[in-house]
């Protein structure tokens, strides 16, 4: 079959050496040809297994001193959950067989690192096997400044308190031009990169995200992915890449877009982003996650033929996307996730945060084991 993707570009992709120019060229390829190539690389990287994690999101407060123009979750006077209230949610997660809790919240002027350490220590004291995937680079940076300690020391203390991995959120688009418009008080690009590098050095793996579809250019999207790839080449500490389409509702950035006649990214554009992500990250980051909360379940399912291999988590609650207009729910059952995966002709496997497989053992107790590409 004749391909509209140049052979030399395909060869660079197989070798994990695609350039910015290659990525921009791929965006011009007929969509289904692009999807076929991304799907081929997905097969080479991880095979036909599609993973998911049983987890719970816990947002401990909507109060925030930040000024992010894309956020519909922030309030000036929202409740701050106590550690005991957080633990009640963790207990519910444990009863639901969750292996992970993902805890994040707004930036509080009076809350330093001790609060975050206290959360981690309380969880590990009661549930030592529960994986704590929590506290964004922005939260760690903010808490370190409140506590007047270096980020490196903050991460060391969090690791000692029980933090296992860190979500690579607050990345948005790693372009200072973009960040000045949508989140002027947030970490600059170099600061975000440094927090993530320091986390990896401290033995705390992270994910990496990209929130696209607002004021950024195509070139800035590709630059963002290449920054993430460069970090991975250096540290090897990134477990997955998660493209997140911007929800342009109930927030200033989105309201301005809509006044200008621009809306959420079309589904075809979302799928092209996932496909190009797979191609750019081939040989570097094996796991490309589709967010069913952002995409909707059917488009997330279809993305499994466009380069993705993971559908994220059961979540149990999801306040941030919902407040910005996402309408696809905030909880999904394991049965429905596996139904979606089977419906795409793939093999479902529950995983841990670090992409190890979770299996049923005798007596219905679960054990964690290595699983090929997920290790």
Curated annotation (Swiss-Prot):
SUPFAM superfamilies linked: Radical SAM enzymes
Residues that, per the record, bind [4Fe-4S] cluster: 64, 68, 71
Radical SAM core domain mapped to chain residues: 50-284
Protein EC: 2.5.1.147
Keywords on record: 4Fe-4S, Iron, Iron-sulfur, Metal-binding, S-adenosyl-L-methionine, Transferase
Free-text cofactor note: Binds 1 [4Fe-4S] cluster. The cluster is coordinated with 3 cysteines and an exchangeable S-adenosyl-L-methionine.
Reported cofactor(s): [4Fe-4S] cluster
Top-tier EC class: transferase
InterPro entries documented for this protein: Aldolase_TIM, CofH/MnqC-like_C, CofH_family, Elp3/MiaA/NifB-like_rSAM, F420, FO_synthase_su2, rSAM
Domain of life: Archaea
Pathway it works in: Cofactor biosynthesis; coenzyme F0 biosynthesis
Gene Ontology molecular-function annotations: 4 iron, 4 sulfur cluster binding; 5-amino-6-(D-ribitylamino)uracil--L-tyrosine 4-hydroxyphenyl transferase activity; 7,8-didemethyl-8-hydroxy-5-deazariboflavin synthase activity; iron ion binding
Catalytic activity, reaction form: 5-amino-6-(D-ribitylamino)uracil + L-tyrosine + S-adenosyl-L-methionine = 5-amino-5-(4-hydroxybenzyl)-6-(D-ribitylimino)-5,6-dihydrouracil + 2-iminoacetate + 5'-deoxyadenosine + L-methionine + H(+)
Role according to the record: Catalyzes the radical-mediated synthesis of 5-amino-5-(4-hydroxybenzyl)-6-(D-ribitylimino)-5,6-dihydrouracil from 5-amino-6-(D-ribitylamino)uracil and L-tyrosine.
Family stated for the protein in its record: Belongs to the radical SAM superfamily. CofH family.
Binding partners and assembly: Consists of two subunits, CofG and CofH.
Protein name: 5-amino-6-(D-ribitylamino)uracil--L-tyrosine 4-hydroxyphenyl transferase 1
Source species: Methanosarcina acetivorans (strain ATCC 35395 / DSM 2834 / JCM 12185 / C2A)
